[in-house]
UniProtKB/Swiss-Prot annotation:
Gene Ontology BP annotations: DNA repair; DNA replication
Matching PROSITE patterns: BRCT, DNA_LIGASE_N1, DNA_LIGASE_N2
Single annotated GO MF: DNA ligase (NAD+) activity
Keyword Flavoprotein: no
Residues annotated as binding Zn(2+): 430, 433, 448, 454
PANTHER family (alphabetical): CHROMOSOME TRANSMISSION FIDELITY FACTOR 18 (PTHR23389), DNA LIGASE (PTHR23389:SF9)
Domain of life: Bacteria
Native species: Brucella canis (strain ATCC 23365 / NCTC 10854 / RM-666)
Active site: 128
Cofactor(s) it depends on: Mg(2+); Mn(2+)
Function summary: DNA ligase that catalyzes the formation of phosphodiester linkages between 5'-phosphoryl and 3'-hydroxyl groups in double-stranded DNA using NAD as a coenzyme and as the energy source for the reaction. It is essential for DNA replication and repair of damaged DNA.
Amino-acid positions noted as binding NAD(+) in the UniProt annotation, renumbered to this chain: 42-46, 92-93, 126, 149, 185, 301, 325
Protein name (record): DNA ligase
Amino acid sequence: MSDISVEKLTELEAAAELERLARAIAHHDELYHAKDRPEISDAAYDALKRRNEAIEAHFPALVRDDSPSRRVGAAPALATFAPVVHARPMLSLDNAFSDEDVRDFVGSVYRFLGQLPDDSIAFTAEPKIDGLSMSIRYENGILVSGATRGDGTTGENVTANIRTIAEIPNRLPAGAPAVVEVRGEVYMAKSDFLTLNAQMEAEGKQTYVNPRNTAAGSLRQLDAKVTASRKLRFFAYAWGEMSDMPADTQLGMVEVFRQWGFPVNPLMKRFNSVDGLLAHYRAIGMERPTLDYDIDGVVYKVDRLDLQTRLGFRSRSPRWAIAHKFPAEQALTILRGIDIQVGRTGALTPVARLEPITVGGVVVTNATLHNEDYIKGIGQKGEPIREGRDIRIGDSVIVQRAGDVIPQIVDVVLEEGKKRGEPYQFPHVCPACGSHAVREEGEAVRRCTGGLICPAQAVERIRHFVSRNAFDIEGLGEKQVEFFFNAEDPALCIRSPADIFTLKKRQENSLTKLQNIEGFGATSVKKLYDAIDARREIALHRFLFGLGIRHVGEVNAKRLARAYLSYAAFEKAALEAVPPKEGDRTDKGSEAWQDMLAVEGIGSIVAEAVVDFYGEPHNREVLAALLAEVTPLDEEARVATGSPVEGKTVVFTGSLERMSRDEAKAMAERHGAKTAGSVSKKTDLVVAGPGAGSKLAKATELGIEVINEDDWFKLVGED
């Protein structure tokens, strides 16, 4: 997960991170829901989901079809249990992590219903059980099936195993509706978990990690006798398909479940105020250590079922419920060292090496230290944190399993009379490649400037270099780039952009032939070589974009190409541009610097990134090798087109049927227009295809002209 704030991500960086997050979250969903083998904590998973949602909110045009925000859980594992399609989807809940989040949730309920706070809508509050979600179906009072949640739409048929859980009735009392689906959580009591582990240890077998995983694994045993021996339990709290509703409130339905013989949680209560909900949350939190079952928060639900119906659902969660998660757990240990990791974007991230400590049932040896200011005791806005205490090797530190993929150090405990180590000096040189590491003004992160040579960034940089809007080399996808990068044979390896263009020649002089390697063949290799050769001449803006200079995305690459017209002119400007001396108000910087700032849309942040990139000798060496193989074509000078859209800002939305989105952007730019990804007051024209949604609504609201795709072709004279 990137450490760059969402607001500072470029569109390219955002798209790349959304792709990585989609893969990571899908991977962890499968491990958690389908294989019962989670690799990360719930808090770490929640952090990935929050990061994904934050990026999507900031870049709505980049929301993917496979976005985790549109998905619940994971599809059931194959070839184990028969699939069951839920009559009503089993959705997940949105999360709240603070009192303010809860107040926002309650406020959103009132606003949606058009009611005032003094109308006193009642909410229920109950512990969020850390187990396995289950749907149990009864027809004419007889238990006919039990299914896991799966991906929310399709679960697994575990009926035989459900029947072994003593707390789940096989029959409902007379008078129950003809069709009943009772939903709840299967879990293992802490005491039963300890007994089971003691038994496994006595038998010389491997013990289990935690009650949740054990319950999930026990329920998905192919032999129901194994499930029966595990003493699984159940809490009922919801329902699916019902032929008749026996109550009109959430609390009333749970009481009906109790009367039918299902266990229900005794800590569930009803409140008419946010303060009541939060007080109960804290009370349950205090009682949490004494409970014989694991919980990870408190769930709030609108009590009246008619209001639940009016509130309805979002794509993956109800509007009438939310899960208020408990804060992370903490422990005290010793900081033994600090290592610096270099991320794919060149960010230098300090990682604490700790004396091993158990936090929340997991042994922790590493923790994130975020950035150099965090080590110094300085917050994101320059304010003191931890009362200004810095972090030093040898300190006693408080470790928390929180919202990061790895735990974090949240405080330092200073011991009176104990001599501390020296203040930590954050490196100004990349430990991976030796290039300068710079920190931009206003940034918390220090970054390596050796983008084209740094091994920590190389794979990501090459992927970017061959991507569609850069060199667009067909046959060099993600897997192929990793294969060539990891190849040890000099005739195969691709470690820098220039290596791509020398691959064919190296292969001709080698006994190791690419076409003989699994996954390749004579035809595919020829196509790859042809695709590479086709890019030996490349448009200047594509060349600049492909270099991966920070802040030089597709738009800025085009701006620079149009301003300098040739690569030679751009390179000369980049090498001669000298920023003004810090603190010297009379210094305006070199003439080349001032010229670069005069380019429309290019400010000091972009210009500094260009200067830093070309100021790194390693990058210039890699560029020299690349330019020996590739020729950036001069950009044609922009002339007035006389087009009716010249100088206007155009937004394309919906499904385009006569052209791709990239073709649409290129056509607009060919006619002198600028394209944007979102609608604002600066937008002049919206071209809307079928399925246009929020952008079309925004354009209508702002009174912006909207035309269809056919009208667009007529307008620009290309019909």
